[in-house]
Amino acid sequence: MTVEIEKDGEIWTIIHNRPQARNAMDPVSAEELVVAFKEFDKSNAKVAVFYGEGGAFCAGWDLKYAQTLNGNRSNELRELDFPIGSSEPPRGPLGPSRLELNKPVIGAIEGPAVAGGMELALWCDIRVMAEDAYLGVYCRRWGIPLLDGGTVRLPRLVGQGKALEIAMTGRKVEAEECLRIGLCEKVVPSGHTREQAEIMAKEIARFPQDAVLTDRRSIIESRGLSVREGMKLEWVNGVDAVRKQGVKGAARFSAGAGRHGDFKKI
């Protein structure tokens, strides 16, 4: 097994543990990650942290495996084709990149998250990067295109022009630049990303989850909609959460809890 799950109450940390290969992704690891994240999505856990053991988040697709995809094995990639219709697609080349989970994932990024590893980082809801970590489309050098959602998620985060520049040059994008342009949400000292991601996960998990997940879903689903359509979606998604938890929360505030922005006693 190259994937481990550590459970701390409502927080799961899903660890890719293949440090001898800089956590490059082969089919075995890809399948194990899909199983782990599907298990998380079905569980009572509220937030997952995605971490690469050994100082590297993920160095991308395992090119030692990729070089074998010729001759009798050339059809293996076809097994990952999207199906006709709306049925669930097979896993991505790097595993969970095609999963649309119902709960948030925080990426804890140490060292390189490059090529397909960058695509996995972009799949996460939130990214916490070490100050010496970096992203980059390093597969540019080897003639391998982005296949795990990079061309979809990158421009949504940084805009089309910056996405094209990063993708076509294949250059290194260091943590501080990632923070500045919206590719990560927090930069922390090296060696502390998992710790800081788990702290953030616990902050998210302690809130009433109907509203947290409703707002997450509305933010994700409203992309591409007009303002009116987006606000209608927000209302449809959110009104039940108000009935389930919001009324009770308002009553607690009226009784004195959480005044003046105090989050300690909620």
Predicted regions and their residues:
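Crotonase-fold acyl-CoA enzyme core
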Residues: 96-210
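C-terminal alpha-helix plus adjacent terminal tail
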Residues: 1-9, 57, 75, 170-176, ...
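Short beta->alpha linker loops
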Residues: 28, 52, 61, 170, ...
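Short, active-site-adjacent cap segments at secondary-structure transitions
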Residues: 55-59, 114, 136, 219
